[in-house]
A protein has these predicted regions:
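N-terminal secretory signal peptides that target proteins for export/translocation
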Residues: 1-12
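Acidic/His- and Gly-rich active-site-bordering loop/insert found
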Residues: 32-148, 157-179
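Histidine/acidic-residue-rich, glycine-tolerant segments that coordinate divalent metal ions
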Residues: 138-147, 153-154, 170-292
Length: 398
């Protein structure tokens, strides 16, 4: 499987880029098999694709807005998944729902034979990120509600309409191949992609292309700057007791959680500068006058390499065991999610850049620029030149 990532600024323009790239990705493989398609034919398809995708601007924006309106947290993307799979089914895609045992996960397929091109993008939102669209300051639709604060409402519109444009050309020109659409469910919780891989859903995929929003328009190859991580919940079991009447009878699970957190915070001094960790107490007991019999804490351990992630994870387990020993409680832990560091393909990155240059940057309006300046001021973002694309040099062998 090949993974590629590029940033998103304007959905319609990205759909055009996506389509152009997919044509380039599919046709060489077809040409090798059928000896049928020359460069001139490929270029003519690209020109037709530009017109095709540009005409779908309104539909793309409607999909972006609809997914934004759902604003569903990880593993709760019920309406989002129903909406997206409904559109795909109407356009001839076969849907497999509940993949990897995740109710809101699915995989959509159209076509047959090779090459098999998979397109993915995340669909979950962020807790307490409700925000009115087009407003450059905090103004929630519903105070405290979840919302799309990371652009996960944009990606599926891009890949779905790009895939539909590719499908049209494949049908028109009798081009064999398979298109696959999949969602990143619970991405904020690291909750699905590793399980898709584990269960073999990408086993026969020739290229997997992934889109995500960013601060500029381009694509990367090599190490893409994203850390890998492991998500772990540590749970402690003790004995309840009345905190005033008979505290000596209790074994506090909350004490164990707090001791683990204290121990880990002392460990931070000895971590590498690139190692990152965060935690939240997810269960701290019921009320102050009862010694908590159960408590839990949720950790993320992040780094750029598998070895350094593993070392943090191992240290966390040791500290948790020590906390359980000190409080005479029992500890168990559960891995909730995991992700390898991103390392993307050079050939796909260069092909994407070539097509980005052909399409060019979107034509920004005065309103676009005004909004951008307001957001930059709000987040104190450094000023950057307008970039058509970027390619990161690989920081380790391909």
């Amino acid at each position: 499987m090949i993974m590629q990532n590029y940033s998103l600024l304007v959905p319609r323009k990205n759909a055009i880029v996506f389509f152009l790239f997919l044509v380039v990705a599919i046709l060489p493989a077809i040409a090798q098999q059928a000896k049928k398609y020359d460069v001139a034919f490929v270029e003519s398809m690209k020109k037709e694709a530009l017109s095709n995708v540009a005409s779908k601007e309104k539909a793309v924006q409607e999909m972006v807005d609809m997914v934004f309106s759902f604003g569903e947290l990880g593993f709760q993307e019920i309406e989002t998944s129903k909406y997206l799979t409904g559109i795909l089914e109407k356009n001839g895609f076969k849907i497999e729902r509940g993949i990897s045992g995740i109710p809101t996960a699915w995989m959509a397929k159209w076509g047959n034979g090779s090459p098999v091109i998979a397109l993915g993008s995340d669909i979950d939102c962020i807790p307490k990120a409700s925000q009115k669209p087009g407003v450059a300051y905090k103004d929630p639709i519903v105070e405290g509600a979840p919302g799309h604060g990371e652009g996960h409402n944009s990606g599926q519109a891009v890949i779905i309409y790009a895939a539909l444009a590719v499908k049209e050309q494949m049908q028109k020109n009798n081009i064999p191949g398979t298109l696959v659409i999949w969602p990143g469910v619970a991405e904020e919780l690291v909750g699905s992609k590793a399980w898709y891989i584990r269960d073999g859903y990408f086993k026969n995929v020739d290229a997997c292309i992934f889109t995500h929003v960013s601060s500029d328009f381009g694509c990367d190859y090599g190490d893409n700057g994203g850390n890998g991580l492991v998500s772990v919940r540590f749970s402690f079991d003790g004995d309840a007791a009345h905190a005033a009447g008979a505290p000596w009878r209790g074994k506090s699970a909350l004490d164990a959680v707090e001791l683990m957190d204290v121990g880990w915070n002392f460990k931070r001094e000895h971590l590498k500068p690139t190692q990152r960790s965060h935690y939240v107490i997810t269960d701290g007991g019921d009320q102050p006058n009862v010694v908590p019999s159960k408590a839990s804490v949720w950790y993320y351990f992040r780094e750029r390499t598998y070895e350094d992630i593993q070392s943090m994870y191992d240290a966390g387990v040791k500290i948790a065991n020590g906390a359980a020993m000190m409080t005479d409680t029992k500890m168990k832990y559960q891995i909730l999610g995991t992700a390898w560091p991103g390392h993307f393909n050079k050939a796909l990155g260069q092909a994407m850049i070539a097509n980005i240059k052909k399409v060019g940057l979107p034509q920004w309006t005065d309103a676009d620029n005004q909004m951008a300046r307001a957001v930059q001021k709000l987040v104190e973002a450094p000023k950057k030149d307008n970039q058509v694309c970027r390619t990161s040099a690989p920081r380790r062998p391909q």
